[in-house]
């Protein structure tokens, strides 16, 4: 499921004890976006790739792969087996159609962009147990009539 470069990046990140939040401060990009570069779902600029590889102590020759547009959405199998990723699949199974209806009531017939899009993860402290807050913000794209 992970490429050789993903494994190298994750291994170097662990060895250096660097967090995605720290890389966010270094690169000036969101931590989720940086993680998506690690998993080859986003493309870094040459400058971003150089900063990232330098911070991780990796060979700058790897920059070429990080700056090449990747094949996106290549998770396998179709139904994820990782428990955390599966929860998002499960959320869409339960709330996908209701979410679609609410979005279309507010915006009309269309979709939320995953290209003009941001994804943020926050920790919300709660006495009953900390909570994960995921915020998706995508441009609404109305279906064209012709």
UniProtKB/Swiss-Prot annotation:
What is the species of this protein? Synechococcus elongatus (strain ATCC 33912 / PCC 7942 / FACHB-805)
Return the InterPro entries for the record.
Cro/C1-type_HTH, Cyanase, Cyanate_lyase_C, Cyanate_lyase_C_sf, Lambda_DNA-bd_dom_sf
| Family affiliation | Belongs to the cyanase family.
Its Enzyme Commission number(s) read 4.2.1.104
Pfam families documented for this protein: Cyanate_lyase
Catalyses: cyanate + hydrogencarbonate + 3 H(+) = NH4(+) + 2 CO2
Q: What does this protein do?
A: Catalyzes the reaction of cyanate with bicarbonate to produce ammonia and carbon dioxide.
UniProt-annotated catalytic positions? 87, 90, 113
What is the name attached to this protein's record?
Cyanate hydratase
Q: What class of enzyme is it?
A: lyase
Top-level lineage group: Bacteria
The alphabetized list of GO BP terms reads:
cyanate metabolic process
């Amino acid at each position: 499921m992970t490429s050789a470069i993903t494994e190298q990046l994750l291994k170097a990140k662990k060895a250096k004890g660097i967090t995605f939040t720290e890389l966010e401060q270094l690169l000036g990009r969101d931590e989720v976006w940086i993680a998506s570069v690690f998993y080859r779902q986003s493309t870094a600029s040459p400058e971003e790739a150089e900063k990232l590889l330098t911070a991780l102590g990796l060979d700058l020759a790897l920059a070429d792969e990080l700056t090449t547009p990747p094949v996106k959405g290549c998770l396998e199998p179709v139904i994820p087996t990782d428990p955390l990723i599966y929860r998002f699949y499960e959320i869409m199974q339960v709330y996908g159609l209701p979410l679609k209806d609410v979005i279309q009531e507010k915006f009309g017939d269309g979709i939320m962009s995953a290209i003009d899009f941001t994804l943020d993860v926050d920790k919300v402290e709660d006495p009953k147990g900390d909570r994960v807050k995921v915020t998706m913000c995508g441009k609404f794209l109305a279906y064209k009539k012709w």
